[in-house]
Amino acid sequence: MQKQSNINSVELSRKSEELIKASSNRYRAVVQVANRAKRRRYEDFDNFDEQAVKPVIRAVLEMSDELMQPEIISEVGNNIDR
């Protein structure tokens, strides 16, 4: 069973660099990505279909999207408060 993803390595590299540049502390950015990946791995443990993308790659993509689109974060925060 081979996992395949349609993630472009150049795009992934660019998004990773954006995350690191936006962070004041490179170590903290890496730890946040690792923690999110770990959380996603355990959340998606039952969903074998969604495991085509590795958790670290998914975490980088999600965090990069949140960085580029801050309204995502505010929408999530508003839904949590309700």
UniProtKB/Swiss-Prot annotation:
SUPFAM superfamilies: RPB6/omega subunit-like
InterPro entries noted in UniProt: DNA-dir_RNA_pol_omega, Pol_omega/Rpo6/RPB6, RPB6/omega-like_sf
Keywords in alphabetical order: DNA-directed RNA polymerase, Nucleotidyltransferase, Transcription, Transferase
GO biological process terms, semicolon-separated: DNA-templated transcription
GO molecular-function term, one example from the UniProt record: DNA binding
EC code(s) of this entry: 2.7.7.6
Swiss-Prot/TrEMBL catalytic activity: RNA(n) + a ribonucleoside 5'-triphosphate = RNA(n+1) + diphosphate
UniProt entry tagged with the keyword Transferase: yes
GO cellular component: DNA-directed RNA polymerase complex
Subunit and partners: In cyanobacteria the RNAP catalytic core is composed of 2 alpha, 1 beta, 1 beta', 1 gamma and 1 omega subunit. When a sigma factor is associated with the core the holoenzyme is formed, which can initiate transcription.
Chain's role: Promotes RNA polymerase assembly. Latches the N- and C-terminal regions of the beta' subunit thereby facilitating its interaction with the beta and alpha subunits.
Stated family: Belongs to the RNA polymerase subunit omega family.
Protein's name in the database: DNA-directed RNA polymerase subunit omega
Name of encoding gene: rpoZ
